[in-house]
C-alpha cells in the first residue's frame, strides 16, 4: 500500500510466522496495537490479488468494541471505525469499474467522514458483508439504479 491509501492491517509473511494467521495477527499488533489476545479470529475470506500482483489472504476477527487502538506512526496515520449498519444501507459515494486480467468488477467506493474506502479494501469489505450479513452486494454487475 502507498502513503495516504486506506487499508486494513496487513503485510508480508515473515520467516518466524508459523502461518498466515500469525502474520495477520503480528501485523495487526505492529500497525494498530491490537495484540492476538484481543482478537477472536473467525475465519478467512477469498484470496485476492492486488493491483500490484500480491496475493492477499484476508482474515476476519472480532475485537472489543472500545479497544484503544495505537497507530504505529511510521505506518498508520489514523484508525477509525464505521458502523456495519452504515455499509449494509449501501451508502456508496460512487462505483469504480475495475478491470484486472480477465476480471471486470464494479466496486463500491464508500466515503466515511474524510475517508474513502475503495479498491482492494472495498472488495474485501464487500465479501465480508455478503458472507456475514447476506448483504447482497454484487460487484460482478453494474449497480441498479
Q: What residues fall within each predicted segment?
A:
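Short aromatic/basic micro-patch
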Residues: 7, 81, 119
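The catalytic Nudix box helix
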Residues: 8-43, 83
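Short, charged/polar surface micro-motifs in flexible loops or helix N-caps
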Residues: 14, 64-67, 85-87
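Acidic pyrophosphate-coordinating catalytic loop
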Residues: 47-55, 68-74, 117
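NUDIX/MutT-family hydrolases
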Residues: 71-113
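GST superfamily/GST-like fold recognition
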Residues: 103-131
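Charged phosphate-binding loop/patch that engages nucleotide di/tri-phosphates or the phosphate backbone
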Residues: 135-145
Amino acid at each position: 500500500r502507498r502513503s495516504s491509501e486506506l487499508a486494513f492491517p496487513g503485510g508480508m509473511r515473515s520467516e518466524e510466522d508459523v502461518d498466515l494467521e500469525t502474520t495477520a495477527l503480528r501485523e495487526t499488533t505492529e500497525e494498530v496495537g491490537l495484540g492476538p489476545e484481543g482478537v477472536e479470529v473467525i475465519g478467512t475470506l477469498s484470496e485476492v490479488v492486488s493491483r500490484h500482483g500480491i496475493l492477499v489472504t484476508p482474515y476476519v476477527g472480532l475485537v472489543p468494541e472500545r479497544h484503544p487502538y495505537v497507530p504505529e506512526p511510521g505506518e498508520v496515520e489514523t484508525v477509525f471505525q464505521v458502523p456495519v449498519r452504515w455499509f449494509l444501507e449501501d451508502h456508496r459515494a460512487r462505483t469504480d469499474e475495475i478491470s484486472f486480467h480477465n476480471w471486470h468488477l464494479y466496486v463500491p467506493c464508500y466515503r466515511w467522514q474524510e475517508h474513502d474506502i475503495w479498491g482492494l479494501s472495498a472488495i474485501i469489505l464487500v465479501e465480508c458483508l455478503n458472507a456475514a450479513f447476506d448483504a447482497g452486494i454484487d460487484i460482478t454487475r453494474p449497480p441498479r439504479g
